[in-house]
Structures are given as C-alpha cells and as structure tokens.
Amino acid sequence: MAPRGFSCLLLSTSEIDLPVKRLLSSVF
C-alpha cells in the first residue's frame, strides 16, 4: 500500500528498532 520510498525512509528512521525494521522489511 505504501510506496517503496516511504518504506525505505521509515526503515531509515527506525534504524534503532531492529525487530520493527525486520518486520517492516518482511511486510513491504
């Protein structure tokens, strides 16, 4: 649903949250 750029930016912003980062990476 969200653009790849947005997801990439989101991952960049939450680089501290590794679990969340991995989860988002798996979702997107």
From Swiss-Prot:
It comes from the Eukaryota. Keywords: Cytoplasm, Secreted. Induction: Down-regulated 6 hours following staurosporine (STS) treatment and up-regulated 24 hours following STS treatment. Up-regulated 6 hours following beta-carotene treatment, returning to its basal level 24 hours following beta-carotene treatment. GO terms for molecular function: receptor antagonist activity. GO terms for cellular component: cytoplasm; extracellular region. Its main location: secreted. The keyword Nucleotidyltransferase does not apply. Highly expressed in testis. Also expressed in kidney, heart, skeletal muscles and brain. InterPro entries: Humanin (IPR028139). It is found in: Secreted; Cytoplasm. GO terms for biological process: negative regulation of execution phase of apoptosis. Pfam families: Humanin. Belongs to the humanin family. Plays a role as a neuroprotective and antiapoptotic factor. This is Humanin-like 2. It comes from Homo sapiens (Human).
